[in-house]
A protein has these predicted regions:
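Conserved C-terminal portion of the radical SAM core fold
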Residues: 1-60, 78-92
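Terminal RNA-binding accessory module
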Residues: 64-187
């Protein structure tokens, strides 16, 4: 039912960004259920996806459940789910190259912001793909912006070459991408 609903939503609202969050390793999660979730992630191709490993809390109902998943298994499943989403995010980023986006300029990028753009992001906790040409920022001044579907401190950023008016929406053209961020130029 949910796959059909998502397909109808996407058909009815072109360009919509669908986001969700999953907990990996909840007590009783079997390998088969996890594989079903992975298939759902791969088939649905969410625009934004968060994954968290279940953390046992003493005194909670779930904390007392049988079938607690070993940390190593949760970590492996987390990594596998995020790898699947990273592949989806890269494909979605690549598909946006050459397209125009309306972005909200947040601030001028500092050297520290730019260093983090092609190496590591605390937002995602994942190493960026720095081997691709599109994953690197060329020297120069950048504005950090957000797309219309991007939540601050959670989603990727749009690094726009040059200066945009901070606090305003501006149109940009996507010219590259990292795993989760876009690189753009003003239109």
């Amino acid at each position: 039912y949910i796959r059909d609903l998502i397909a109808r939503i996407r058909e009815g609202i072109p360009g919509i960004a669908i986001r969700t969050t999953f907990i990996i390793g909840f007590p009783g999660e079997t390998e088969k259920r996890f594989e079903t979730l992975l298939d759902f992630i791969r088939d649905t191709k969410f625009e934004r996806l968060g994954v968290f490993a279940y953390s046992k809390e003493d005194g909670t109902r779930a904390g007392g459940m049988r079938g607690q998943i070993p940390v190593e298994t949760k970590d492996a499943r987390f990594a596998e789910a995020m790898a699947a989403q990273r592949k989806i995010a890269r494909a979605k980023g690549k598909a946006l190259i050459g397209k125009k986006l309306n972005v909200l300029a947040e601030k001028m990028a500092t050297d520290k912001d730019l260093q983090g753009a092609d190496v590591r992001s605390w937002e995602h906790g994942l190493i960026r793909d720095t081997n691709r040409r599109s994953a690197k920022l060329v020297d120069g001044q950048y504005t950090i912006a957000r797309g219309e579907a991007d939540a601050p401190d959670i989603d990727g950023r749009v690094y726009v070459q040059g200066e945009l008016p901070v606090g305003d929406f501006s149109w940009v053209r996507v010219i590259g991408h990292t795993d989760y961020d876009l690189i753009a130029e003003p239109v």
